[in-house]
């Protein structure tokens, strides 16, 4: 199971002083000693393309965002009007005005057929691109990147911001690849005044100079142990593991990546002074610092009740502000061509509005969004019928989305991963 970095700790600073310098300092990665050795042994040159994946847990309504049906009966079209977008002839709903304004900066997939309407299995299927199979836990995208490219800097190759993933069936996890490729989960509010990352932030009173002194003391103890222990290879490997932990804790790029307060106020304001907005800003900073795959998660999208009020008042405004700004910011910094931005969700919502002013799970249609990394912007792919219930043109599946993601990340089309027992697993089944 993935070990969250904000799980049980020994004091209010986050971790015990003694535990801070133990090999367990990498526990936030879900690593054991042998796990680490496997991960470093498999490290390969990094691809030049990184990825930021937005995951909205619960199933975001396509009707009320990017696939409005203004001519449908009121029981289908809902409460929101359709507005024009930057794409000639394209329309979104009025509660995503910023997306509409910048629709020429991303590609919208309206022809997605999720073929599933259940939570949990959705997290596994959509975030891996492989149909749910109870016998095989297919890895999520970031875990595959970790598996094939490994550590390329002091920071982990795969980081997840916020903890809105249903892991009952292995969704969002490394699955068959082993715990060492699970995401490094940061479930701390990036918008908080005291934002810090546990397990890589020294407890109060422990300076980095003090860390170095402790490291030198431990090195002397280790030297004595070596004289009495003939397992030199194991000790050397342990040194490498320990050094990786120390590098992550003490490396300047680690502190710089998470120092979100160093951003100009105007930049932070542009993303939005809310948890989701600052998480997107932090994702950009992590990519700049060498993290190859960042997943930003958000919850509360299972709108069986009060769908319209929830979307308008709380759920959509932060995303409507932050995601277009993320794309713009990456572009202005020259990072968009080397960074794929993807927005995925469980599935769509029912065309017909229920008695609780909500929409239920819908397994036949939904949406996805992509930008950057050479994705043709300003295009709408696929279409749905008059009520948004079924794909009427250019149908795409989660397997096809996975193929596109892996293609942009430079993965081979015949991508095979081997589990801990050596069993091969094919990871790509769709078309780009």
Set out the residue ranges of the language-model regions.
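Ligand-binding pockets and gating/stacking loops
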Residues: 1-432
